[in-house]
Amino acid sequence: MARPRLQFLGLMPWVQQTAIRGNMRATLSRPGQLADLVADRLGGRGAFRQLVVSSRGRMLRAFQAEEPSEGGRVRLRRDAAYESFLTFDALLAQGSTPDAAALRDDLDELLRSSLLTRGFMLNCGECRTVQFTPIERVGRTYPCTRCGALNSLTGDRWHRAGSEPEFYYDLHPAMRTILKDSGDLTLLLGNRLARLAEEYSDLAEVEFAEEGAGKPSFEIDLIAHRDGDLVIGECKEGDLGGGQTRQQLIAKRLDAAELLRADRIVFGTALPEWPTGDQDAVRTLASSRGIKAQIDFIADLRRH
């Protein structure tokens, strides 16, 4: 379907104007805002999509480790959750990069984009809290982030250090949240859709609400413009669920397809293959509603 206004306006403004014509409003959800923040730091959605399939992206998964602290990995409680912080050697040992030189290049790029922060594991002489302290906050003294005490940078403040403290790395909280909530799947689906396309752009995590409503009617994981076609995508770690839950999920994606006049609806999963029951349920409901959009199922999204 030709959409000259989409080419002129850009994808998000076009989606918003199309939603208004359907008496709805479209905005980035909180996950979408986080994805936008990271994409801006990297130089755009295309760069973000490439990150998740690169050695750098695979290396970042080490920060999601939930095992107790060991070796060069320290797990600390921060805010309401436990988070892992890693040394250079610990990142090298997890094997996403072939050698130390490649890892150094990856770390340099991620530090330049501020997705990683370099610092020290230090404890507080007053409250004894062990904390990650960014390198720019450390001089002859450093403040405790918990109690505010000013500590001297001396040997008794170093956590697990030998003769000198090691550098540790911290992952940006937005990227931690994206990985924890499977936000990489929309990027991986975007990569699949972008293959062999002459023109491709996309948005992640857009929510639609009726005018005046307090909460969204539905949220779309991915909206893409591919070689003139409007594509909406739904991403899952597993299947679509069952019973009424599955029917409601499918119905809302079909609502979005009708609102945006989508040419294609794509369901993606991290599972090795889509259950036949899910495929049948989608096609049956789409047929009953007269949906003309092409419907596709893509599995094994993390295989690349």
Ranges and model annotations:
Residues 1-304:
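Intrinsically disordered, low-complexity Ser/Thr/Pro/Gly-rich regulatory segments
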